[in-house]
């Protein structure tokens, strides 16, 4: 369908309102290991969905200069930091990415010590697997000797962002290392897509699930890593090759609606919009910055259509799968419930904002 720039801007306004208005409804009971209640829905909680959401807001603010949005972001961090930060793990690191990107642009003195302390502790103390990968420990579970593709977005991008902004290459070096280790064990050489996880204890990829959102973390993650930090030329070339292989596979699996399924290669699994938004963002951005052909852009625009079709009048993105643990069979992924979330909102925001960066016959009209 033809989409105007005005339509995209209106949808973006609704998405921001929908995200900041999210509240847990008691549907999910997921207590943390320290006994505190886990809240992966409400905007005011410090967790990974909110961290991804804030990254989307910071990227949107950086593009628009919206002072009201900036105030919302800074107020969120001021309140959460004053209340006391949670224990460090992979998922509680996610909000640090948006804070780093905000600090990189504004250099607020109050945020720099928080960022530096967290980044230093990640490198020094975050549990590692064999070969030095970050073990995917989260607030409610220890995942011994496991690599998950989510970790690259939740942790490695923060290290790259803050390392570049602070002039400390050791953090960028660690981000590079994590992308390389995770690619070694999670990238499927046969399909070009990525498996959800790897266990060093069993030395296998669990269900060998080619999971949609997990793959979108990689698409977004590689492109944003290259965009935000000066990484080694050899690592850059290697990761771009990995990305090209992934996208070649994705282009063959896009549904007629423009969406992708939660199990990318399984036509019986449902179409899932957070993954679709991440792929749309990556495809449009990759084409715009000259890393891919026009085919990427056209597939990204079809994904943009699919995302817009799932933004409700209340600004809430529909058909987003809830937070997904490691599955030991493929049915596990098919059965994940659909639930509005901060990351669903954020990935949609990233996709729509990138759509505005791609002027064409679909988005130029006012």
Label for each model-derived stretch:
Residues 19, 60, 73-76, 80, ...:
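Alpha-helical solenoid scaffolds that mediate protein-protein interactions
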Residues 70-72, 82-199, 204-208, 314:
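Extended ligand-binding groove/face enriched in aromatic
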Residues 149-153, 157-262, 269-280, 294-322, ...:
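Extended ligand-binding clefts on enzyme/binding-domain cores
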Residues 4-49, 63, 67-68, 79, ...:
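CBM-like carbohydrate-recognition segments
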Residues 56-64:
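A short, Lys/Arg-enriched amphipathic alpha-helix followed by its capping loop at the start of a domain
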């Amino acid at each position: 369908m033809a989409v105007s720039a005005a339509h995209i801007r209106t949808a973006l306004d609704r998405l921001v309102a929908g995200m900041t208005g999210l509240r847990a409804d008691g549907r999910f009971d997921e207590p943390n290991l320290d006994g505190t209640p886990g809240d992966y829905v409400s905007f005011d909680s410090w967790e990974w969905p909110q961290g991804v959401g804030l990254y989307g807001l910071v990227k949107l603010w950086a593009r628009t200069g919206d002072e009201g949005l900036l105030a919302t972001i800074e107020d969120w961090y001021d309140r959460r930091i004053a209340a006391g930060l949670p224990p460090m793990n992979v998922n509680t690191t996610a909000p640090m990415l948006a804070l780093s990107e905000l600090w990189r642009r504004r250099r607020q003195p109050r945020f720099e010590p928080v960022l530096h302390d967290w980044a230093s502790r990640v490198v020094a103390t975050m549990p590692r697997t064999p070969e030095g990968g970050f073990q995917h420990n989260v607030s409610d579970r220890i995942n011994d000797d496991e690599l998950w593709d989510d970790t690259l977005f939740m942790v490695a991008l923060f290290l790259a962002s803050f390392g570049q902004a602070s002039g400390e290459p050791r953090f960028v070096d660690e981000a590079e290392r994590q992308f390389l280790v995770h690619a070694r064990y999670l990238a499927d050489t046969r399909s070009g897509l990525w498996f959800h996880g790897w266990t060093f204890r069993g030395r296998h990829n669990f269900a060998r699930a080619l999971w949609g959102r997990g793959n979108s973390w990689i698409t977004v993650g590689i492109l944003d890593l290259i965009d935000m930090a000066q990484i080694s030329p050899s690592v850059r070339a290697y990761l771009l090759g990995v990305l090209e292989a992934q996208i070649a596979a994705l282009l063959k699996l896009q549904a007629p609606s423009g969406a992708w399924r939660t199990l990318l290669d399984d036509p019986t699994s449902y179409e899932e919009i957070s993954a679709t938004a991440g792929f749309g963002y990556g495809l449009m951005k990759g084409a715009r910055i000259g890393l891919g052909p026009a085919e990427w852009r056209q597939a990204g625009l079809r994904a943009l259509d699919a995302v817009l079709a799932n933004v409700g009048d209340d600004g809430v993105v529909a058909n987003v799968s809830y937070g997904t643990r490691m599955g030991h069979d493929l049915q596990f992924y098919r059965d994940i419930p659909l639930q509005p979330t901060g990351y669903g909102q954020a990935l949609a925001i990233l996709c729509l904002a990138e759509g505005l960066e791609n002027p064409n016959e679909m988005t130029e009209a006012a």
